[in-house]
């Protein structure tokens, strides 16, 4: 193992001892926020320190066995012990490398999911509805909560745009690689000749901003407009100005919300979406800066990238970033995303390990 990695592991082991001492103090719970912070740090450091302890024991075992090589009676035993210790060291080094990978601070957050119809007109809007159902079914399998924040329906029951909030354990970490262009190839219900059409939707997955302090929005930077809500085909049109449009002047980001009959609740929802979009813009700027020095295709999240194709006649779904093709489109559209999500996470981890090797 490289010296830089060993030095980092020594630092983490020392820090765990400090955290243990702080948690053992009689007044440890006097500041409950600090206590929770230390408890989280303890939970993060403990697995690393445990594996590092096993690694150091394997190093000691190797040194002891090597010292026995000069003894003719112990030579065979020592050779077996050396082989065993080296095997353990190799395995533990791999485990420690994964444990040292940088954690995404947003992984444990809830998320805001935006789906927008793109090329393909009404068929694209119908596919946006199919994608919403796919993600909703996946969320239900995880026992997550799904709340529609804003929707703009098309004439045939699809969505020109739909924004939902998904809340649940590590929701963002599971779906963060879904951002990008999703292409569909199928015979539309409106196609009389039976010809296959290609259309596309854009998906954006953004971590939900904290209620307080995560994204600073100055009230003077906001323009707030209210107007009457309008449903598809003129349905459920409110007679009061309950719909809200927020414009963030420094970034030009505009958010509308008209789903609720309460102007106050519409404003609250719009503020959540606005904060998520501002946070997302900041994250993507940081990622673009990082990408200028290292290309990370999986995590780029570029909305213009076509990341996946859903080919209904062939029954296949292909993720172009990792060249993975699965012939179970019906199951995937019904929310069975586990194989895709896990494969993308594994590829991202491999990218991180490669980067760790370059930087060490």
Swiss-Prot record:
Organism: Cupriavidus pinatubonensis (strain JMP 134 / LMG 1197)
Domain of life: Bacteria
Name the record gives this protein: Peptide chain release factor 1
GO cellular-component term (any): cytoplasm
GO MF term set: translation release factor activity, codon specific
Gene3D superfamilies listed in its UniProt record: 3.30.160.20, 3.30.70.1660, 6.10.140.1950
UniProt xrefs under NCBIfam families: prfA, PRK00591.1
Known role: Peptide chain release factor 1 directs the termination of translation in response to the peptide chain termination codons UAG and UAA.
